[in-house]
Amino acid sequence: MPSLFARLRPASPPSSVAYDAAVNVARQPHWYRAGAVPDTMDGRFAVLATVCALVALRLEADGEGGNAPGVALTEAFIADMDAQMRQEGFDATLGKKVRHLVGSLASRVDRWRGVTDANWNEVVRRSLYRDQPVADDTLAHSVDRLRGLRKKLAALTLDKVIEGHWA
């Protein structure tokens, strides 16, 4: 009878699958070791927001078909940030802080939308390191990984992106 009960439970929304994939990519140790992103709440947020920005842009590239999944991805991001902030005890100013985090995601999306071969290093530096000094080899590692992620996302169908087949 488990299949009968499984049908009664709503399936995980596709947005949460894509968001879970983004979280899995952002948790990869290479960002914090070879990439030297600080392994702090802010550093982990920077990686997650950067990965989500690249996924959002890939969804956006599919035009109208990517609109609903893009909104759903953002909603999953907001719900997770809200839960994380509550867990950290930021209840008094939660709304303001979550709005700030969503604004940070939106600014990353805009920044990545305008990335060119000439400004990749600058965009990665701002997105992951917030203009902090970073060694050339460290920056090169992060640039390489983000270029690879962008290329992988671009090569997949919309369904595969939504299903997280890029993580």
Regions found by a protein language model. Give the residues of each.
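Surface/interface-facing alpha-helical segments and adjacent flexible terminal/loop regions used
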Residues: M1-A167
